Curated annotation (Swiss-Prot):
The lineage of its organism: Bacteria, Pseudomonadati, Pseudomonadota, Alphaproteobacteria, Candidatus Pelagibacterales. It comes from Pelagibacter ubique (strain HTCC1062). Keywords: Amino-acid biosynthesis, Cytoplasm, Glutamine amidotransferase, Histidine biosynthesis, Hydrolase, Lyase. Its main location: cytoplasm. This is Imidazole glycerol phosphate synthase subunit HisH. GO terms for cellular component: cytoplasm. Residues 2-208 form the Glutamine amidotransferase type-1 domain.
Amino acid sequence: MNVTIVDYNSGNISSVINSFKEVAKDKVNIEVTSDLNKIRSSDKVVLPGQGSFKSCVDALNAINGLVETLNEFTVTNKKPLLGICVGLQMFADLGYEETETKGLGWISGKVSKIDNQNNKFKLPHIGWNEINIVKESKIFEGIKNKSHMYFVHSYEFIPDDKSVISATTDYSSNIVCSVEKENIFGTQFHPEKSDKLGLKIIENFLNL
């Protein structure tokens, strides 16, 4: 099986690479690339994302044909894709970090700044927080409800269709921290920084 972690110059993704390689061992071939042909021929794709919504979208668009190839992989061919942090946020139609920016539009919705309730909640939201699993999800197999995952973000994805939400976390409000829509999976938290439970989520994705 071939799995591609998309490297589109969106910040340091070494921890994502290391975690996937640790779980994959020699059973899965992990490629780290933005090569369009390698993405097309992959069985699964991982879309990481660090930085702002706009900077990540701009970095994707800067590589000729990458967005079209990801659309073909995910929407047309319906192969499994996992978005992590801003990788998940880019599923949205629009993001409002820095300026209004068009997302990939795979899951209708928007990305807005977390309401800190007059500085009652610190932003960015950094650290371990409990997740509330709200529907059965393939990537949560073997993960207990109320498990703790690691977060670093100031913006939240608000999908129009609430049925895609697989988990939330309570920080200022019920923030979406995981989605599943057919072959599209996303986590707002960082599985690669979430210790053994995070590695289990990576394993579940690789086992799809």
